[in-house]
């Protein structure tokens, strides 16, 4: 049985603009999870963890990526390989598995593993937001770094890190040693994608970049202009690879959306990393 416990009645409703939404909240292992269904005729849900938006899932069309940073992640994937070509993907951090569903819908032959530390959250998502049964998509309830450290070399085309605990990525997933391990797990032309929440002067991003620039040959940063110019807090997506990233293609793709993304190349990423050094496992970043 799912370990989730509803704490708000399933028919509780709230008005949001001209829409009426259905809210249902649950206690899970690491947070209070709230599912918000838009009453638009579609089976579209937003997952909030402790009141913060975590994932958006449209069960009728998993190709719809409503959160801009998740769309940028999908954009990078779509620039890496022709439509339909499998991209075996390891997801460090699960949420409602928006990106994994997108990959399953657009590249159904891809093998994917989603690692989520919160077992009750996985139960909730499996029950309330079910995905099409397939052996190509597996969930593992475990510590993401521990799974990464046990993954065989060259097992994946893509590794995606989108894991947060108390508003921050776990330290064990931010270290130089973690980046080195990701590089080992990736195939030679593989790509590591990292979601960072930050604002100017980009201290968190600088630490991430210091590690990734030391490990990978090419690194780029994607965000919206208002964030990059220091006007507000927001998401930054970092792409790192030993292959040359298709910067021009990614730039065109991320600029074509509701919120136009901008790409900073390796040279600009290096400038963002100045004054920062990589975190090490010995400093408290080990999965232990």
Which residues fall in each region the model found?
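A short, structured beta-strand/loop element
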Residues: 41-57
């Amino acid at each position: 049985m799912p370990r989730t416990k509803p704490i708000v009645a399933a028919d509780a409703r709230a008005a949001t603009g001209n829409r009426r939404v259905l809210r249902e909240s649950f206690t899970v292992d690491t947070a209070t999870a709230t599912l918000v269904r838009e009453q638009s005729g579609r089976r579209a849900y937003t997952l909030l963890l402790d009141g913060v938006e975590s994932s958006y899932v449209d069960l009728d069309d998993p190709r719809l990526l409503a959160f801009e940073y998740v769309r940028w992640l999908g954009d990078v994937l779509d620039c890496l390989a022709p439509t339909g070509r499998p991209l075996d993907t390891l997801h460090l951090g699960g949420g409602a598995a928006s990106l994994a569903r997108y990959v399953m819908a657009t590249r159904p032959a891809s093998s994917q593993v989603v690692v989520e530390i919160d077992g009750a959250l996985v139960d909730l998502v499996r029950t309330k937001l079910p995905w099409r049964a397939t052996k190509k998509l597996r969930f593992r309830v475990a510590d993401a770094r521990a799974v990464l450290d046990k993954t065989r070399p060259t097992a994946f085309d893509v590794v995606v890190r989108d894991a947060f605990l108390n508003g921050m990525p776990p330290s064990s997933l931010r270290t130089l040693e973690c980046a080195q391990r990701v590089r080992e797990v990736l195939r030679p032309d593989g790509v590591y994608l990292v979601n960072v929440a930050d604002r100017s002067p980009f201290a968190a991003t600088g630490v991430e970049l210091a590690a990734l620039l030391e490990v990978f040959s090419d690194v780029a940063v994607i965000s919206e202009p208002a964030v990059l110019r220091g006007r507000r807090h927001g998401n930054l997506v970092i792409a790192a690879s030993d292959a040359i990233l298709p910067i021009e293609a990614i730039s065109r793709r991320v600029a074509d959306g509701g919120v136009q993304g901008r790409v900073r190349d390796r040279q600009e990423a290096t400038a963002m990393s100045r004054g920062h050094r990589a975190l090490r496992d010995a400093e408290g970043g080990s999965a232990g």
